[in-house]
Amino acid sequence: GLWDDLKAAAKKVVSSLASAAIEKL
């Protein structure tokens, strides 16, 4: 459903930000 899509998108964003942050360390 829409909520599941939003949660999936949020997880992707969080993962991307986390990866970028780790690479900068």
Curated annotation (Swiss-Prot):
According to UniProt, the tissues expressing it are described as: Expressed by the skin glands of male frogs.
> Does the entry feature the keyword Coiled coil, yes or no?
no
Q: Which UniProt keywords apply?
A: Behavior, Secreted
Asked if Secreted is a keyword of the record, the answer is: yes
> Which domain of life does the protein's organism represent?
Eukaryota
Q: GO terms for CC?
A: extracellular region
List all membrane-crossing ranges: none
Question: Which residue pairs form cystines in this protein?
Answer: none
GO biological process, any: male courtship behavior
Tell where it localizes.
Secreted
Task performed by this protein: Stimulates aggressive behavior in male frogs. No effect on female frogs.
Its protein name is Aggression-stimulating peptide
Q: Which organism is it from?
A: Leptodactylus fallax (Mountain chicken frog)
Organism classification: Eukaryota, Metazoa, Chordata, Craniata, Vertebrata
